[in-house]
Amino acid sequence: MPLRLCFRSAIVVLALSLATCGYIPRPVEGVPAGAPWEALPLRKWLAEDRAEPQALAFCAPPECSPGLAVSVVRLKGRDAQITHAVLRDPERLARALRSPAGRDKPVRTRISVEPLKDAPYPGFAISLAPADGRKAPAYGAALGRRSGESLDVVLVIGETEEAVQDTARRVAERELGS
């Protein structure tokens, strides 16, 4: 093969490799790398201008018990301001979830929120369950760090309160710094 053709082929391969880098998932710091945890190439999946996804990983039963999903997102501008206010006062979120705009009937969900104490950044824990109590609650936690106009947020959703809060604190320590 002539040298010029090899060079052109190498440039094409390099260009294609660089173009697909967005499809290579970034692992979430603070959760184990590799199986049973799976990282997703989130940046190419979400095209909204509201948040920049940084990383997403999940671990599903039966390999992982309890099941957990962890994400790291960056917000800017007004979205960062609103989210930062909710991180500091999670009862705002609970009120909005209980009486969403445009609904005539109240939501039939038990919602409880509480600030995360002893956390290095503002954040909260939340639980959501059907009001009839037929299903177990889902748990969530969020912690965020402000940096200028942007806000980096760690979100964790899972099946047990303790696992969610422990994971949120551990990931926030690694992703947001201590």
PLM feature spans:
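Surface-exposed amphipathic alpha-helical segments
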Residues: 147-178
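Sec-dependent bacterial lipoprotein signal peptides
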Residues: 1-21
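Post-signal peptide N-terminal segment of mature Sec-exported envelope proteins
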Residues: 30-52
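Stable alpha-helical elements in mature extracytoplasmic
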Residues: 41, 89-93, 164-171
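Short, solvent-exposed coil/turn segments at beta-strand boundaries
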Residues: 40-44, 63-64, 118-121, 144-151
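Bacterial Sec signal peptide processing site at the extreme N-terminus
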Residues: 18-36
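A short, solvent-exposed beta-edge/loop patch
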Residues: 124-158
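Conserved polar/disulfide-associated segments of primarily extracytoplasmic proteins
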Residues: 53-138
